[in-house]
């Protein structure tokens, strides 16, 4: 797989709402992903995209606070984080998998029952191969969202 895109992200009828933006300790999982200490802060941003009042997908961005401050990351008011130009990025690594939605994500997407989702993940790497940002798009199973996979 060479990449993937989400054509509706740029559609004019698509509405975006920032659900949360918080600084919090990295914890064990993100400390390992970003090669930082467990107590170092990370910036977590969640945005919901919908059409006609119906939630389509949830987009997440996670990056270390020191990285966001140093690079002055420009978070777009409209459009996808997927096209976010991050300074210092040497390469990216992408993956596509089926995951179970967390309770918080189910609530944001206004889903009442547990459901799987397609998870598109992109890691942004610096010149030394360290992860400097992590983006995820969660598309719920049974949704009307379209995805194009390039080979």
Question: What is each model feature region?
Answer:
Residues 39-52, 118-125:
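A short beta-strand signature
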Residues 14-17, 44-46, 51, 55-61, ...:
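A short glycine-rich, His/Asp/Glu-containing loop-to-beta-strand
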Residues 1-41, 66-90, 145-151:
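HTH-adjacent hinge/linker in prokaryotic transcriptional regulators
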Residues 55-56, 89-91:
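Short, structured loop/turn "capping" segments at alpha-beta junctions
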Residues 58-67, 135-144, 150:
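A short, surface-exposed beta-strand/turn
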